[in-house]
Curated annotation (Swiss-Prot):
Protein name, per record: ATP synthase subunit delta
Any single GO CC term annotated in Swiss-Prot or TrEMBL for this entry: plasma membrane
PANTHER family: ATP SYNTHASE DELTA CHAIN (PTHR11910)
Domain of life the protein comes from: Bacteria
Subcellular location field: Cell inner membrane
Amino acid sequence: MSEPASISTGIAARYATAMFELAEEAKALPALEKDVDALDAALSESADLRDLIHSPIYGRDEASAAIGGVADAMKLQDMTGNTLRLMASKRRLFVLPALLSELRERIADHKGEVTAEVTSAKALTKTQLDKLTKSLKAQVGKTVTVKETVDENIIGGLIVKIGSKMIDTSVRSKLNALQNTMKEVG
């Protein structure tokens, strides 16, 4: 992991810990989850918001006022709006995507949920998704949400990622392994 990424991750983790603990104490985790979803959607949809959090041309006061206006317009919780203003005043808005990811993980963990990123060569049927979800739930002991991606380059099979664990049963990886074995022999 590169140095700037690890610094960003550390900063995001500290903010996420503070926000999560405050929301948990106030029994406001569902509201925090709504704020996370809303901010995530806003970041995906608004180039101006992405520019605001990444561009160094905005001063502390400008960024704080702008992000405060965004928080007010989105009707975010006071805690979320205040955190965003604090991040702007400390020039830390660039960690917002990592903060949202960290908060999403903490909320899911608190609810006993985990997200599995599943890559397949073609879209899985409803039956296949149900079987996979049941199998993964039995393995991890938590409720599993499947985030499906289609990548024809894997030829067949699946790549399943849950947290830091990955199971790669794709035909592409098996062909690559066979190719490496053949290189070693010849």
